[in-house]
Amino acid sequence: MTKITGIIAEFNPFHKGHEYLLNQIDGPKIVAMSGNWMQRGEPAIFDKWTRAEMALSCGADLVVELPVTVSVQAADFFASGAVDILKNLGITDLAFGSESAIDYNEIADIYETKETEMESFIKALPEQLSYPEKTQMMWQHFTGIKFDGNTPNHVLALAYAKAAAGKNINLQAIKRVGKFHSTKLTEGFASATALRQSLFSLTERKNLLTEQTHQSVSQKPAILDLSAIKNHVPSVILETYASPKTNWAAYFPLLQYKIRLDDHLENIFQVNQELSVRLKNAVKSAKNFDELVELVYTKRYTKARVRRLLTYILLNIPKEFNLPKEIHILGFSKAGQEILAQNRGKIISKIGQKPWDELTQKADEIYQLGNVDFKEQNFGRKPIIKREK
C-alpha cells in the first residue's frame, strides 16, 4: 500500500514551522485545512484560497476544505471531522506537531480498547467543569499523561489519537521547535499568533503612510513592508503575505447587531438560555470583540468556547445540521491529482449550480464582508493547480 500522509491544519498564516512539518514527511501529503473560520473562533487572516496556495507552494500535494461545522469546533469534534475526511481520501498516516514525545499510537490503542469506560468517566464528572478540563482528567486517569497548561498542540494531538483509534492510521508526531504561541517575533520559528499581530501592525502603518501621502501629494499608496517578517516566512510565499486580510474588528459591528436584535439566540448551535442572557447583557457595554469575550466567559464557559459561540451567532449556525457528503478541493499538485483520480465520486471541484455545503457557503459570504478586496469565495472558483517546475 502506498503511504499517503494526512495533515490537519489551519495555516493561519502559513509559516516556516509549517514548512518544516511538511519537509519531515515522505510521499504524497493531503492537507485537510480549515476554510475561512478557525477552530478557536476567529476569521482567518487570509482567505482559504490564499492559504491553500501557500501550502501547495511549500510541499502539500492536495488541499481539501474542512466545512465550517467541523473547523469551528472544540478539539475532539474538530479532530474527528477532519480525520474522517482524510480517511475517506485514503490516508495511511496522520502527521502533526506536538510538544510531547509520547507514542500517540499507543494512546490510540488505549482509547480503542477502553472507549466506553473513558467516555463514561467524562460523563460522570461534575457539570461545572469545562469540557477541556474533563478531557484532561480522563487522559490523566487512564494513561497517566500530565498536562502543564502550555501544550496546546499536545492536547490537539491527543484528540487526533482519539479520532484515529480503530481506523488503521499510523500516527506520526513531529517534535515542535520554537514558541508556537508566543506573541513576539523571535529567533527561529515564529508563531502564527506573532505573525498575525505583526501583519496587522504593519498594515496599520502602511495605511497611515498612504493617508499622509495622499494628503501631501498625489502619489501611489504606500507598499506593505514585509521585511520585519521575512525571516519567519518561506521566501517562496513572502509576497503572498501582502494579500487582503481581516480580523474580528471587521465583524464586531455585525455581531453586535445580531446579538441585540435576535430574540431567539437559543436556536443557535450550543447557545443555551444562560448564555443568551449573558450575551445580551454583555453586548451593551463591550467596545470590541475581546471585551465581549471577557465579559461572557466563566470557568465553565472558557474563552475559546465563548469565541466559538460568538462565531456561531455571527454565522447563524443552527442547532441541527448535516455534514456535506462530498469533499471540496482547494488545490492539488500532480501527485495530488493521482489521489483525486482514485476518489472520483467523493469530491467536488467547482461550486456552481450544484451547492456544496450551504452553511459553509453562507459563512464565506459573511467572511467576504471583512475586506472589500476579498474575491468571491465559492461560485466559479476552480481548484489551484500547482505547476511542476
Swiss-Prot record:
List the GO molecular function terms: ATP binding; ligase activity, forming carbon-nitrogen bonds; tRNA binding
What are the disulfide bonds?
none
Q: Which reaction does it catalyse?
A: cytidine(34) in elongator tRNA(Met) + acetate + ATP = N(4)-acetylcytidine(34) in elongator tRNA(Met) + AMP + diphosphate
Checking Pfam families in the record gives: HIGH_NTase1
Q: Where does ATP bind?
A: 8-21, 97, 153, 176
User: What subcellular locations does the record give?
Assistant: Cytoplasm
**Keywords tagged on the record:** ATP-binding, Cytoplasm, Ligase, Nucleotide-binding, RNA-binding, tRNA processing, tRNA-binding
Question: One cellular component GO annotation, for this chain's record?
Answer: cytoplasm
E.C. designation(s): 6.3.4.-
Single Gene Ontology BP annotation: tRNA modification
Q: Which family does it belong to?
A: Belongs to the TmcAL family.
Q: Which HAMAP family match?
A: TmcAL
PANTHER family, A to Z: TRNA(MET) CYTIDINE ACETATE LIGASE
Q: What does this chain do?
A: Catalyzes the formation of N(4)-acetylcytidine (ac(4)C) at the wobble position of elongator tRNA(Met), using acetate and ATP as substrates. First activates an acetate ion to form acetyladenylate (Ac-AMP) and then transfers the acetyl group to tRNA to form ac(4)C34.
The protein's name in its UniProt record: tRNA(Met) cytidine acetate ligase
Taxonomy of origin reads:
Bacteria, Bacillati, Bacillota, Bacilli, Lactobacillales
Q: What gene is this protein translated from?
A: tmcAL
